[in-house]
């Protein structure tokens, strides 16, 4: 299953979710491939890697069809395709391609080639609405849209328009992140999603905790840095919820 984690708006916990959800699924002995598809490469650095030291990145696979699959092995069940600064230039090259259908399916075709044997592939998509976002959408079986307050709903609207314009049908779910029950903006978002789209909103809410922030700054997931924290509990809960939904779908 390919899950793209995206929002048009940055700063909503997108990369944090890709990293810690992947780690949580790996703890459940699911084989997981993380894909850093954002030119900021924050997922790569959160995983404790220096982008400059990564010889084979997602950009390599975009340019070399015969590139041997050489992901970074983070632990027994968790792997990473590192990001690359070159993704900005790659995006412009995609936009200039003669065949637009080929341009938006580059990532999908890469993951089809290298993804065999993985239970989950988590794509950390770039913010915005350009070719990188479109590739993340076209590749996805499901999308997770992290949101930290009602201001992020604007980004959701733009993603919805992209999906409709391209006639795509990924299953989309909203994830409330960086939640602080003391703040009215956070509570307004939670109340709105529960009232307006309960079936599309994960029951799990990711609380705002210092452990989550510090874990990423130290190149670790929350289970390495603060295994008994609220953040660890929340991402474990999310992983179980996603795995449960997949099991229910496979029974149908």
Regions found by a protein language model. Give the residues of each.
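P-loop NTP-binding core
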Residues: 1-252
């Amino acid at each position: 299953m390919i899950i793209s984690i995206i929002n048009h708006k940055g700063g909503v916990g997108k990369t944090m979710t890709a990293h810690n959800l992947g780690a949580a699924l790996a703890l459940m002995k699911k084989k997981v491939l993380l894909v850093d598809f954002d030119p900021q490469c924050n997922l790569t650095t959160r995983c404790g890697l220096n982008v400059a030291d990564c010889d084979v990145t997602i950009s390599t696979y975009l340019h070399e069809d015969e590139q041997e699959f050489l992901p970074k092995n983070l632990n027994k069940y968790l792997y990473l395709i590192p990001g690359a600064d070159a993704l900005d230039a790659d995006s412009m090259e995609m936009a200039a391609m003669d065949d637009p259908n080929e341009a938006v399916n580059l990532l999908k075709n890469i993951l089809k080639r290298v993804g065999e044997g993985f239970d989950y592939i988590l794509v950390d998509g770039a913010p915005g609405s350009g070719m990188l976002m479109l590739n993340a959408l076209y590749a996805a079986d499901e999308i997770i849209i992290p949101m930290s307050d009602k201001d992020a709903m604007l980004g959701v609207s733009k993603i919805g328009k992209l999906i409709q314009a391209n006639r795509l049908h990924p299953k989309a779910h909203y994830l409330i992140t960086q939640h602080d029950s003391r703040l009215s903006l956070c509570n307004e978002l939670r109340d709105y999603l529960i009232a307006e789209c309960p079936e599309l909103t994960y029951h799990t809410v990711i609380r705002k905790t210092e452990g989550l922030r510090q874990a990423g700054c130290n190149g670790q997931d929350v289970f390495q840095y603060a295994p008994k924290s609220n953040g660890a509990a929340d991402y474990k809960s999310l992983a179980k919820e996603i795995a449960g939904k997949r099991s229910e779908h496979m029974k149908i």
